[in-house]
Amino acid sequence: MEIKKYFFYALFFLLFFCLFLSKLQAYKFNMSIVGKVSSYTKFGFNNQRYQPSKDIYPTGSYTSLLGELNLSMGLYKGLRAEVGAMMAALPYDSTAYQGNNIPNGQPGSRTDPFGAGIFWQYIGWYAGHSGLQVQKPRLAMVHNAFLSYNYKKDKFSFGVKGGRYDAEEYDWFTSYTQGVEGFVKYKDTRLRVMYSDARASASSDWFWYFGRYYTSGKALMVADLKYEKDNLKINPYFYAIFQRMYAPGINITYDTNPNFNNKGFRFVGTFVGFFPIFATPANQNDIILFQQVPLGKSGQTYFFRTRFYYNKWQFGGSVYKNIGNANGDIGIYGDPLGYNIWTNSIYDAEINNIVGADVINGFLYVGSQYRGFSWKILGRWTDSPRADERSLALFLSYFSNKYNIRMDLKLEYYGNITKKGYCIGYCGMYVPVDPNGPGTQPLTHNVYSDRSHIMFNITYGFRIY
């Protein structure tokens, strides 16, 4: 009888809810409930035990699971609201048996209560709102919770959004922000300002709760002015991490065929310049996980990219150059490259040396697509004072429109030579007599590490309403 009673309660609620929605349609109300589930695996071919005394620094492997649900509502004439939540899990972590040399009492050490391995630093990492005090991992978050309003009349429009939401179309900021932004646009020119109180990585390969870990406990503000007409886009901007960094920059892009639809020819050329000025002492180290290079007083980033399209084929190349430690405070949680730069090793900095101090990178790629299948081959050459890297990667992707399933596979050869005088991992920790014990010390010679790996991601999307 109890089951029958609750069934009728649920049926009554459903009928009432449907009637309520039908009435709201007259007021321009609309709603959707969508979600996805995904699994991500990175498997490093260098899967030996961690033995720094023998110059063995493995890559590490892990598998994560992610579930997501989002409710989106169009409330009334340009007013929208969205709320969504995510939950992650870490079913496999190779570092549980590969070991590490983190001192006892520190996050990730042998006595760490958070887990037998250290990949919780990727899936679940939480260091409080400040981003500076490591706490118990968080495997669930409300990543979307915002209100937005957009108004448009003739050639004039403006909009505002506040809460937690996915930050879009920023050269040096990606993923989710907790904050507010607004824009004003007239004809082909738009002014936009964003204030970010905290940032979150919300994906199947990285799951970090909202915090200020990427700005050393400070807030971030961005202002950009974009002019876009026909084939040309000119986008000057300014990024500020208060009391730490101030950075003007510009993106200039020329596109011969903005409405390209896989037929004919298209060329897209992009130049990005970024010029951070640091307000911290010149000898203070960067926040990149290397933490081995002083920030200095200023830096420069120059990025040139060419992309060619012919029917379903594409090819091109790019050059990325840092003068000084330009990305020491920004450029690691968002960059204009368009490539995943977090593919190194958990035993070093997972981030590549692509954004290191005084680095120069070259990229070449070719690819094509057929129906739901696409492929790409990407080669990378990286030289920097800290490390040199060579990489050749094959990307395969397939999307089934019928079943709403996407599969992505990457197979990458990746070699890294870390140079004498630098550390693989954190420098400056206590180093005992045991060379495999706690602590990391500068290398006495160059060390080659195989960072080759395979990545596989499968995602199923669904719609409830």
Features from the language model and the residues they span:
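Surface-exposed coil loops of outer-membrane beta-barrel proteins
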Residues: 109-226, 233-236, 240-242, 337-355
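Outer-membrane beta-barrel translocator/channel fold
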Residues: 91-95, 192-233, 237-248, 257-340, ...
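Extracellular loop and loop/strand-boundary signature of outer-membrane beta-barrel proteins
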Residues: 52-57, 131-133, 165-168, 208-212, ...
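Transmembrane beta-strands of outer-membrane beta-barrel proteins
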Residues: 29-37, 79-83, 156-160, 182, ...
